[in-house]
């Protein structure tokens, strides 16, 4: 808190009616925490500025297209902030803008990447089992996916990219007792990298 306060968050105010949006992946409660710091330093700003959270949903290398065409989840500090953010994003986003509150929007981003992590962990764990059982995991997954309601991902050496390997920790750190599956998935995917390295040796 002191470190954030030293950066003068209250000084971000320019004029009444300004909108401030957080897009970075953040723990649940970040938007509210930032608002408390700002209004703690500058109480006269309360109800005069708008604060919202809208997680980015873009793929590197295709940023402009996805920025325009992807659906967005927008959650304000209050209903007025949500509407203000909707009005801003509607100027350039052609996808659907889904309204919610800031805590749900924050959790939505963490859920998206944690869901991918869990799905990848299942495929990776399956590959470990198949290695022990003498079964071709690629053939197995291909056959299992013939079922109309089964869609197993392909196993690999953990997970790719930066976000998926990091974002689940925002959930497990704040809700350790309730996030055992998410935590186990992280362990499996981390272990798979070392397992693959040993196989190469």
Residue spans for each PLM region:
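Single conserved hydrophobic/aromatic residue that forms the stacking wall/gate
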Residues: 1-13
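Conserved Rossmann-fold NAD(P)-dependent oxidoreductase catalytic core, especially the SDR/UDP-sugar
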Residues: 17-32
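Hydrophobic alpha-helical scaffolding
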Residues: 24, 75-78, 112, 116, ...
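Generic recognition of short, well-ordered alpha-helical segments
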Residues: 32-33, 166
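Internal alpha-helical scaffold of NAD(P)-dependent oxidoreductase catalytic cores
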Residues: 36-54, 58-150, 178
């Amino acid at each position: 808190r002191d470190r954030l306060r030293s950066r003068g968050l209250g000084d971000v105010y320019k004029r009444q009616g300004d909108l401030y949006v957080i897009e970075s992946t953040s723990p649940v409660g970040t938007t509210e925490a930032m608002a408390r710091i700002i209004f703690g330093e500058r109480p006269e700003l309360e109800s005069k500025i708008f604060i919202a959270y809208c997680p980015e949903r873009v793929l590197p290398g295709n940023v402009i297209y996805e920025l325009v065409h992807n659906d967005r989840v927008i959650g304000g500090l209050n209903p007025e902030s949500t509407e203000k953010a909707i009005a801003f994003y509607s100027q350039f986003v052609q996808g659907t803008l889904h309204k919610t509150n800031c805590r749900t929007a924050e959790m939505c981003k963490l859920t998206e990447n944690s869901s991918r992590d869990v799905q990848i962990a299942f495929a990776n764990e399956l590959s470990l089992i198949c290695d022990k059982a003498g079964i071709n995991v690629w053939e197995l997954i291909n056959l299992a996916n013939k079922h109309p309601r089964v869609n197993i991902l392909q196993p690999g050496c953990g997970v790719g990219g930066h976000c998926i390997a990091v974002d689940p920790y925002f959930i497990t750190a704040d809700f350790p007792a309730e996030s055992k599956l998410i935590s186990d998935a992280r362990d499996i995917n981390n272990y798979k990298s070392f397992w693959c390295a040993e196989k190469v040796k």
